[in-house]
Amino acid sequence: MAAKIIDGKTIAQQVKDEVAARVTQRLAAGKRAPGLAVVLVGENPASQIYVSSKRKVCEEVGFISRSYDLPATTTESELLTLIDQLNADQAIDGILVQLPLPEGIDNTKVIERIAPSKDVDGFHPYNVGRLCQRAPLLRACTPRGIVTLLERYNIDTFGLNAVVVGASNIVGRPMSLELLLAGCTTTVTHRFTKNLRHHIENADLLVVAVGKPGFIPGEWIKPGAIVLDVGINRLESGKVVGDVEFETAQERASYISPVPGGVGPMTVATLIQNTLQACEEYHDHAE
C-alpha cells in the first residue's frame, strides 16, 4: 500500500494565506505591517536563491521587507553594527542573517547579537533554551514547519518512537526537542551512531536531515512509519532528491514527505509565521 503524500506545498500556502489575512486585519485596524530584515553577506549562489524566495514571500503576505546585501569583504564588526541598528528599529520585527557567513565572521557571535524577540530563525540560545524548557517562544523554522505538517495531517505523535537522523543546530537538535514536546520517545542519530539501520527499523516517525541523496535505503523503513525528509540534494542530472530513497520508502510508509514539495516550502512559511508572532506578541505593546 502506497503512503499518503505529505503535501508541504499546499500546507505552506495555507499558512501564508492565514498570515496574509492577519496582515490585512492589522492594516484595517490601523496597525503597521510586520517587517522582516534579510541580511546577506557575500555572493554564495545557493544563499542568493534562498534569500530571494524569502523576500518574495514577504511581499506576497504584505510584510515590509528590507534587504541588506553586503559584500564578502564586510567585517564582523560592521555586521554586528548593522544588527544593533536593526535591533533598535521599531519597524523591524524579524532579523534574518543568511548562513553560512564568509570566513572570518563568527556565526555564533552574530546569532547571539540578534535580539531574541527578533530572532525569527529561532537560533538564538535563549530561544533554543526556551524550547528545551517546554516554554517555546520563537522556534527554529524547519522543525516548527514539520510539527505544523504533522498537526495539519492530524497525525497523533504521542507515544511514538521518533528517530532524527542528523544532529545539526538548525534541524536535528531543535527537531529532537520539538518531538519530545510532541510526546515522542526521541532518539537522535549522527555520524558516530553504531547500527543506524537498527534505529531506523524501529522508528514510528523518522526525520532525516543529513544532505546526502538516498542516504536511507527504503527497505529500512518500518511498515506504517511516518517519514519526513528534510534533504534537498541536486543530482548531476539536475534532478532534486531527498535523503531517503523515495520509491521503496513510499511502499512501506503510511505517510511520507516528497522532495521537492514536502518539508522545504514549510521552512519559509514558518519564517513568515515567526515574524508575525514576533510582531504581535513582542513588539505591538512596545509601540
Curated annotation (Swiss-Prot):
Pfam families this protein is in? THF_DHG_CYH (PF00763), THF_DHG_CYH_C (PF02882)
Any one biological process term the GO annotation gives? L-histidine biosynthetic process
Pathway assignment: One-carbon metabolism; tetrahydrofolate interconversion
Its GO CC terms? cytosol
Q: Which reaction does it catalyse?
A: (6R)-5,10-methylene-5,6,7,8-tetrahydrofolate + NADP(+) = (6R)-5,10-methenyltetrahydrofolate + NADPH; (6R)-5,10-methenyltetrahydrofolate + H2O = (6R)-10-formyltetrahydrofolate + H(+)
Query: For binding NADP(+), which residues are annotated in this chain's numbering?
Result: 166-168, 232
Task: Report which superkingdom the organism of origin falls in.
Answer: Bacteria
Q: Which GO terms describe its molecular function?
A: methenyltetrahydrofolate cyclohydrolase activity; methylenetetrahydrofolate dehydrogenase (NADP+) activity
Asked if the record carries the keyword Lyase, the reply is: no
SUPFAM superfamilies with a match to the protein in the record: Aminoacid dehydrogenase-like, N-terminal domain, NAD(P)-binding Rossmann-fold domains
Its biological purpose = Catalyzes the oxidation of 5,10-methylenetetrahydrofolate to 5,10-methenyltetrahydrofolate and then the hydrolysis of 5,10-methenyltetrahydrofolate to 10-formyltetrahydrofolate.
Assembly information from the UniProt record: Homodimer.
What family name appears in the similarity comment? Belongs to the tetrahydrofolate dehydrogenase/cyclohydrolase family.
User: What protein is this chain from?
Assistant: Bifunctional protein FolD
* Phylogenetic classification of the source organism: Bacteria, Pseudomonadati, Pseudomonadota, Gammaproteobacteria, Enterobacterales
